[in-house]
Amino acid sequence: MQCDFRVHQDARLARVYYFTEVWWMFIFKFLEPKMLINSVLFLAIWSSSFAEESSSSDATSNKRAAMGFQDMRGNKNLIPTSLEHNKLSKRTLMDFQDNKDSNAPDIEDNLSHEFEKRAPMGFQGMRGKKGYLTPDFEDSYFRDEKRAPMGFQGMRGKKVVSDDDYYKRAPMGFQGMRGKKSLEEVLGEIEKKAAMDYYDTRDKKTYVFEYPEDYEKRLLASIRGKLKEFPMEWEKRAPMGFQGMRGKKSLLDEIEELEKRTIMGFQGMRGKKNALENYIDYYLDPDMDFDKRAPMGFQGMRGKKDSDKRAPMGFQGMRGKRNTGQRFDTGINFNIRSSNEYQGTNNRRNALASCQLEKRSPFRYFEMRGKKNPRWELRGMFVGVRGKKWATAPYEDDSPFISVFDNTERIGVDGDSPAILGNSIS
C-alpha cells in the first residue's frame, strides 16, 4: 500500500513539473519583464506550498495506522475483510481502488512490523505480556507501587511486610486453635493485657467499652491464686470455653463412659471373651456350657449359640456327624438312650429326650438335608442321608446286627419287609 501511494505521488509530481515547464515557456515568449518577475514569484510560492503539503501527507501516513483502531484484546486478522475493503476504498484514491484485491498480501507484509498487540503507551493492564518499555531493574519498584501503601489490603497479591504492628490473630477471645497452649501462658497474657486500658491495633474496633470498666480487674481477682487447683491435664488446653480441639481425652471421662456402656442390652459385638476364665470353667466342669458371650441381651453374633437359647426339640438336621454311640445301645435290642444331642454335648437336657422322639416327621419322608431320628418301624428302609455310615467298630461281634445291615440292600427285592427283618433279629 505504501509503495503504491509513493508511485501515485511521483505521477502527480511529474504532472506538476510538466505544467511548470509549459508555464515557463509561455512566460518567456509572451510576457513582459515585470510580469515575468511576478510569475516567477508565484510559481516559487506555489511549488513550495505543494512540497510542504506532500511532505505533511507522508508524515501523517507514517505516524498513523493503516486502518481501524487496533487496541483491542487479542490479535487482529491482517487479511482485509469485505467491510474493511469498503472503508479502504472510501479513503484511498480512485487509482488505488483498481488494485485493492491484488495488494492484500503486500499490505500484510508492510504492516506486520508496525502492527503491535497492545498500545505503545498508556494503561497496559490488559491480558498478555508486560510492556517492553519497562526495564527489568524497575520491575520491583513498579510492583510495589501498584498496591495501596495503607488501609485495607485484602486484594490478591502479597501483603506489605513493613507492617510490624499488625497481629494475625485476635488478642483475646476464642482460643480453640490447633495446637496446645499452657495455662500459665494464658493467664500471663491476660494479666499483661489487663494492665492496659485501651489496645490500639491500627485503629481497629475493640470491644472494651461494651463491658464495665472493672470487668477485667474482677476477672483477674477471681483467677489469681487458682492455678494449683486445676489438674495437670488442663495445662494442655484453654482454661475455659470450647475445648473441641485436637488432643487427648481425660482418662476419667473415658472410664465413666466405659462404665455406662455394655451393662445390659444389645451385646452383638464382634470380639473375644476372656479365654482364661472360660478355659478354667471348662476344665473344672466339662459338662457346663462353654459361654463365649455376655449372659443376657441379644446374642445374634457369629459363633456358637448359647445352649439355653437353642430349640429344645424339633428338626435337628444340621450338617455334621451324629454320635451313634450316644443314640443307640450296643446291645441287640437297640434301646434308645435318654440323650438326644450331638457329639460333645455329653447328655444335656435328659428330661426332654422323651418329647424329642415324638416330634419327628411323619412316615415315608426322608428327603431333607440332615439326619432325622427315625421310628423303629422304618429304621432300616432309608440310609442315604448326608454324613457317614453307621460305625461298625462297636458291633463286629454282634452277628444279628450285621445281618440287619446286610439285608437292607435286599428290602423290596425278594419280598422282604421290615417286619420279616425284625422277626429274624428276635
Swiss-Prot record:
Coiled-coil stretches noted in the UniProt entry, renumbered to this chain: none
Major localization class: secreted
Keyword Hydrolase: no
Keyword field: Amidation, Cleavage on pair of basic residues, Neuropeptide, Secreted
Gene Ontology BP annotations: neuropeptide signaling pathway
GO cellular component entries: extracellular region
Region (Disordered): 299-329
Subcellular location: Secreted
UniProt tissue specificity: Tachykinins (TK) are expressed throughout the nervous system. APMGFQGMR-amide is also expressed in the retrocerebral complex (at protein level).
Pro-sequence residue ranges: 1-116, 131-145, 160-167, 182-235, 250-259, 274-291, 306-308, 323-358, 390-426
Residue numbers bearing the Arginine amide modification: 127, 156, 178, 246, 270, 302, 319, 369, 386
Family stated for the protein in its record: Belongs to the tachykinin family.
Stated role: Tachykinins are active peptides which excite neurons, evoke behavioral responses, are potent vasodilators and secretagogues, and contract (directly or indirectly) many smooth muscles.
Protein name (database record): Tachykinins
Species assigned in the record: Camponotus floridanus (Florida carpenter ant)
